[in-house]
């Protein structure tokens, strides 16, 4: 078996890991892959290795709901730290505490948020010698290959020799073979980007997408995959490996585009290699495969209306706010008199097929009565737009959704006139969590479902997640049938953390004293 030979070769070049746990864990995160799409690929024979694992009974496959919003920061905070309410409303938002917009693709922002999460006193699945690759948060990992660690050049330079350890010994392809394939991939990617941008007459994001295709999806993934092989030979107790290629392409080309599906199918061979190594090393690994959310087609508002969401909500005639909406938002309480507030230019953060609307710079979000008093015109535009399916906002100590002229709390969502594309479970879960999510907008608007598997999008992209459709809320988890853990029936990513910690961490995560 080739993996045994590779393991012996790597073992002669690298020292064993110092940390040990009762069982070793390899956690493979397929970013953005909904369970339905994986099922289709298995039936179509596009993922032969994964299909064999499941059909043989070696692995179990189940769908999972991780909570809402259906975004990677929220999921990773729950998975790694076990936080049920991490106060992470999207991939990008206006942070009331910092007084500015933050983006998880910005290393300094990711570092600030990681420190904030860590300060809540929970230990991570990666504490005690674990390694993470392409995670947003370092979360206590011994290595430094997450978005948050890129914030420190000094830290990265100190870690350079450690990160390179075993890379040459762990290669599975010859140098010239790799360079030839890399060159061909680069050429094809450049041609595809040029063709796409020319057809759309729009080059937005295309240069960064090309860089992502070449540096992250090819070089970066090859590096992370090789390092995971090396880590297993060394006996690193927990390895968290994020495969982001499908997600990156789905955003720019659509979740069912030929390019996105080819990235999904490509992962099958890597999974086969990783699994082979996991069973060939001295202390075998339990391999768990999961996804964080699904993807839906996004039809950009800018294409549909010729304007951005900011223009739709803040400009033009507001129209009348319906009496039913006013009554539902008041909930028997008297209207407030308009109260002068500090000047604040509204901030609208387009997060894909949903958006956060900030109408105040105060540390506390505006509640329904304050919005009725100060910003009735914005409420009217949002609730009357045919391209906005759900408007979520806080009402008293809870939250409600305005859907087609009606106001519904989390326990009333079942009778709301929602499109069948939306997940009522996800809508209710989001409303229950919104009061504690102080970083979320004063309004959170979700694009209307306009076709099967597709919603209006507010950002300039053609695949979105973070919203509340059934596809976005349907994730997957796949685990060994003989592993001492049951990952079926999970209803939140914090539950996943708890079940994994019970088995794969020396002791359950305990509260740390935070000064």
Regions found by a protein language model. Name each.
Residues 268-306, 400-402, 407, 414:
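Metal-dependent active-site segment of extracytoplasmic phospho-/sulfohydrolases and closely related
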Residues 78-254, 353-356, 409-420, 440, ...:
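His/Asp/Glu-rich, glycine-adjacent segments
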Residues 218-219, 231, 239, 246-287, ...:
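A long, amphipathic alpha-helix that forms part
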Residues 20-39, 53, 79, 238-244, ...:
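Beta-strand elements within well-structured catalytic alpha/beta cores of enzymes
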Residues 81-95, 157-166, 261-272, 306-325, ...:
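Acidic, His- and aromatic-enriched active-site or binding-groove loops in soluble protein domains
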Residues 98, 104-140, 328-514:
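Active-site neighborhoods of enzymes that stabilize oxyanions during catalysis
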Residues 1-59, 304:
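Active-site-proximal N-terminal segment of extracellular/periplasmic enzymes that hydrolyze or transfer
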Residues 40-77, 82-86:
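Short, structured active-site-proximal loop/turn typified by the sulfatase FGly-forming signature C/S-X-P-X-R
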């Amino acid at each position: 078996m080739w993996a045994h030979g590779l393991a012996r070769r790597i073992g002669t070049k690298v020292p064993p890991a110092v940390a040990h746990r009762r069982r070793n864990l390899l956690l493979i995160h397929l970013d953005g892959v909904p369970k339905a799409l994986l099922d289709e690929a298995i039936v179509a024979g596009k993922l032969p290795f994964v299909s064999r694992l499941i059909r043989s009974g070696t692995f179990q496959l189940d769908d999972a709901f991780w909570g809402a919003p259906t975004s990677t920061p929220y999921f990773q905070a729950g998975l790694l730290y076990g936080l049920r309410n991490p106060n992470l409303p999207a991939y990008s938002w206006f942070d009331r505490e910092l007084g500015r917009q933050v983006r998880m693709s910005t290393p300094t922002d990711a570092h600030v948020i990681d420190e904030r999460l860590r300060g809540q006193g929970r230990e991570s699945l990666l504490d005690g010698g674990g390694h993470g690759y392409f995670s947003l948060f370092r979360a206590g990992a011994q290595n430094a290959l997450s978005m948050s660690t890129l914030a420190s050049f000094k830290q990265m330079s100190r870690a350079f020799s450690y990160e390179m350890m075993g890379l040459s010994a762990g290669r599975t392809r010859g140098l010239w073979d790799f360079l030839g394939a890399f060159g061909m991939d680069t050429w094809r990617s450049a041609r595809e980007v040029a063709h796409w941008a020319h057809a759309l007459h729009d080059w937005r994001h295309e240069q960064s997408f090309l860089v992502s295709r070449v540096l992250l999806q090819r070089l970066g993934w090859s590096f992370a995959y090789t390092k995971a092989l090396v880590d297993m030979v060394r006996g690193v107790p927990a390895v968290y490996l994020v495969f982001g290629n499908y997600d990156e392409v789905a955003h720019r080309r659509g979740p069912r585009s030929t390019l996105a599906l080819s990235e999904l199918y490509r992962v099958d061979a890597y999974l086969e290699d990783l699994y082979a190594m996991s069973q060939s090393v001295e202390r075998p690994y339990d391999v768990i495969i999961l996804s964080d959310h699904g993807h839906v087609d996004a039809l950009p508002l800018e294409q549909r209306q010729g304007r951005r969401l900011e223009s739709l909500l803040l400009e033009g005639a507001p129209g009348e706010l319906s009496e039913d909406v006013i009554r539902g938002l008041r909930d028997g309480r008297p209207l407030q008199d308009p109260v002068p507030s500090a000047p604040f230019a509204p901030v609208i953060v387009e997060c894909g097929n949903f958006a956060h609307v900030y109408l105040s710079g105060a540390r506390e979000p505006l509640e329904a009565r304050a919005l009725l008093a100060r910003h009735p015109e914005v409420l009217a535009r949002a609730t009357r737009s045919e391209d906005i399916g759900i408007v979520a906002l806080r009402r008293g100590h809870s939250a409600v959704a305005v859907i087609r002229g009606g106001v519904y709390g989390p326990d009333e969502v079942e009778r709301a006139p929602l499109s069948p594309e939306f997940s009522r479970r996800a809508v209710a879960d989001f409303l229950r969590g919104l009061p504690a999510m102080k970083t979320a907008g004063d309004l959170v608007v979700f694009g209307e479902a306009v076709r099967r598997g597709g919603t209006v999008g507010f950002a300039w992209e053609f695949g979105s997640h973070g919203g509340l459709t059934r596809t976005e809320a349907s994730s997957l988890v796949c685990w060994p049938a003989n592993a001492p853990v049951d990952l079926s029936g999970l209803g939140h990513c914090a539950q996943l953390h708890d079940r994994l910690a019970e088995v794969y961490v020396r002791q359950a995560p305990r509260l740390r004293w935070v000064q």
